[in-house]
């Protein structure tokens, strides 16, 4: 937007407001009865004018630099800039804007450059595992605090021995899915509208080049894992557009523990990652999202909870208790990291593990409180069970996957190739070309692919294990359902009606106070706390009564 356009918008906003004030003060005041339809029309016009004024002012403030164009924390932005600006920006200013340089010729030139990118290929095709650690950072980076013991011995050991560095992330305190999006796709969130979550906009309907799609070309099986609701940030919809073949959410896990604040503990992820690796004969790519460190954190001591690690001298006194609770949660996350490393070390398959924090936790940090001086930085580390040279490199979240793949001799996909070959450009040129490439892939004519995207949405399978029904029978005015892979999220529907379901074991469910008849249709569906059905298994009944539960002999 040019300076002249900004001035014209500002003048228009001022003129509209001045006109409304003038009419209100100078127009004749008549005591008449106004028809309801006219009143509604007048009110609608006034609301539209006010909305346009708010939008115009918001755009003016945005482009003049009076307010930020990027919201690292949407909730904090609402507090800082107010509802009108944030709402208008979030609703209307979406997507990646088309550059004046975007053209078929421009993209042909870029495509030619990237097609000639030469990365030293490797004969290794290791399993590749990414673990995104919720709200995870090293608390010793907070200046002045005292800890009764080291909360992250495993992670700090990895940082000192393996390739690692600071990771600049697009969010602070919230917005996990935006760091997640950058890491998987290599796309810069700053190129979208302020406060936008692509998972909830473009990614619900469009496929996008990603690390999963790139590795699928090389024969990898692709898995996503998250120990929280599958519908959170619409991941159950988005992951098929990012190239994943399976997605194991909390609704497909059994036997996990919860934190005092109700989040699943991360130790469950070791077994789920192992299950994904064991599910195929070939190499696997596993993208894992943890949740244990998630806020909110208790502001007062919790009854029955005794922290293992004591924290003193936290710089925000009123958040002292909350931070101590947080430190103890990430201490448990560090234990999970140690267990995962041990498990992967014992496997015969070559494996690379990438660990990183998605953002800092929700505390009133300023840059000055942190030893690294940036609240939009976490850390990453690259571990492997085979020899890799140790490097220290600070990078952006949208550069992480390309960097890891380059270390492994992998160069697939145009965004990955761009990051691997163009980072030495002047920053302005590097980011400008990246934005044009992003626009072409998501919103443009797909010139980089010759006019049509090569990617198709996958038929996403929820969970690794098949949920099966092997038998349904009546016993003592109770319906029993036998099968496999049942858990606390399994619910029974009979002829379309949902019934209260009790899990007896992972192989047996029961519904009290009812009997089934021949040809009744029994469904076991997986539903989370939001009651959205993620998958279902169907069984048509044969009529019989069992003398006892779990008796598979028909009498």
Regions found by a protein language model. Give the residues of each.
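Solvent-exposed soluble domains appended to multi-pass membrane proteins
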Residues: 115-126, 133, 138-502, 508, ...
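Generic cytosolic/nucleocytoplasmic N-terminal low-complexity/intrinsically disordered segments
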Residues: 35-37, 544, 552
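N-terminal secretory/membrane-targeting segments
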Residues: 1-126, 147-166, 201-205, 209, ...
């Amino acid at each position: 937007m040019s300076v002249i356009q900004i001035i014209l918008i500002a003048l228009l906003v001022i003129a509209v407001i001045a006109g409304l004030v003038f009419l209100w003060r100078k127009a004749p005041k008549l005591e008449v009865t106004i028809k309801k339809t006219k009143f509604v029309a007048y009110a609608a016009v006034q609301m539209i004018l006010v909305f346009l004024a708010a939008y115009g002012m918001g755009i003016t403030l945005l482009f003049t630099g009076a307010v930020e164009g990027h919201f690292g924390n949407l909730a904090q932005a609402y507090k800082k800039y107010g509802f009108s600006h944030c709402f208008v920006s979030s609703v209307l200013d979406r997507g990646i804007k088309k550059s004046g340089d975007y053209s078929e010729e421009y993209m042909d030139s870029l495509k030619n450059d990237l097609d000639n990118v030469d990365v030293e290929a490797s004969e290794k095709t290791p399993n590749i595992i990414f673990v995104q650690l919720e709200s995870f950072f090293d608390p010793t980076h907070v200046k002045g605090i005292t800890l009764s013991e080291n909360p992250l011995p495993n992670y700090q050991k990895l940082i000192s021995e393996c390739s690692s560095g600071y990771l600049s992330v697009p969010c602070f305190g919230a917005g996990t899915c935006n760091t997640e999006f950058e890491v998987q796709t290599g796309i810069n969130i700053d190129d979208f509208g302020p406060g936008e979550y692509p998972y909830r906009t473009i990614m619900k309907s469009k496929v996008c080049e990603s690390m999963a799609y790139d590795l699928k070309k090389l024969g990898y099986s692709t898995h996503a894992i998250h120990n929280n609701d599958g519908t959170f940030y619409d991941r159950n919809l988005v992951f098929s557009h990012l190239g994943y073949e399976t997605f194991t959410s909390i609704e497909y896990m059994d036997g996990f523990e919860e934190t005092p604040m109700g989040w699943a503990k991360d130790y469950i992820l070791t077994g789920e990652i192992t299950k994904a690796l064991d599910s195929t004969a070939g190499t696997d790519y596993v993208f894992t999202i943890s949740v244990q460190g998630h806020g909110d954190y208790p502001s007062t001591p919790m009854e029955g909870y005794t922290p293992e690690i004591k924290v003193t001298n936290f710089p925000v006194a009123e958040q002292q208790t909350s931070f101590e609770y947080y430190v103890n949660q990430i201490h448990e996350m560090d234990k999970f990291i140690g267990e995962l490393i041990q498990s992967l070390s014992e496997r015969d398959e070559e494996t690379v593990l990438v660990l990183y924090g998605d953002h800092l936790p929700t505390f009133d940090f300023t840059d000055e409180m942190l030893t690294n001086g940036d609240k939009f930085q976490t850390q990453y580390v690259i571990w492997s069970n085979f020899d890799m040279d140790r490097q220290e490199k600070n990078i952006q979240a949208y550069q992480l996957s390309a960097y890891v793949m380059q270390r492994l001799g992998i160069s697939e996909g145009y965004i990955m190739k761009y990051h691997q070959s163009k980072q030495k450009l002047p920053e302005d040129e590097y980011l400008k070309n990246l934005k044009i490439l992003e626009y072409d892939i998501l919103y443009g004519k797909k010139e980089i692919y010759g006019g049509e995207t090569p990617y198709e949405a996958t038929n996403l399978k929820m969970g690794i294990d098949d949920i099966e029904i092997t038998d349904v029978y009546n016993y003592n005015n109770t319906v029993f359902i036998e099968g496999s892979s049942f858990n606390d999220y399994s619910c029974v529907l009979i002829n379309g009606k949902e019934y209260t379901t009790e899990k007896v074991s992972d192989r047996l469910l029961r519904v009290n106070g009812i009997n089934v008849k021949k040809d009744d249709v029994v469904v076991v569906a997986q539903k989370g706390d939001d009651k959205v059905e993620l998958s279902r298994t169907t069984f048509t009944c044969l009529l019989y009564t069992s003398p006892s539960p779990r008796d598979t002999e028909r009498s």
